[in-house]
Amino acid sequence: MDNLEVIKLLNLDFKGELEATMLYTYNAFIIDDCEISRLIEGAAADEMRHMWWLADLITKRGGRPSMEHGKIEYMEEDVKEALRVQIQKETEGIRKYEKHVKLIDDEEVVGVLRHIIDEEKRHRKEFKEKLEKLK
């Protein structure tokens, strides 16, 4: 896979991290439950860090990170629904990253993507645990 193709995939990943950062930050602002809000705030910070890692990989390969994002469905104050949506976003992100790991033959990129996968799995687990406590 050439650099342009790698950059294209990394920009798709970057877009997902940007959207997650925006959604999680918003949810952390509006959710009254302090424990859940802080958990989501921490995940938002992780997602932003992932953006930095991806931007570094993109620029090292001659590309520019795209700040374009899709439509973000912001939740109102339904904590359970917010957690369900976040679990879904993490699951989708994990699948996308796992697919990209199989497609990309750049050792540095694959190493970073695997690390991000591990963090996304942790987020998903933590969100699931909080959701179970609310049931």
Question: Predicted regions: what is each one?
Answer:
Residues 1-135:
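Non-heme di-metal
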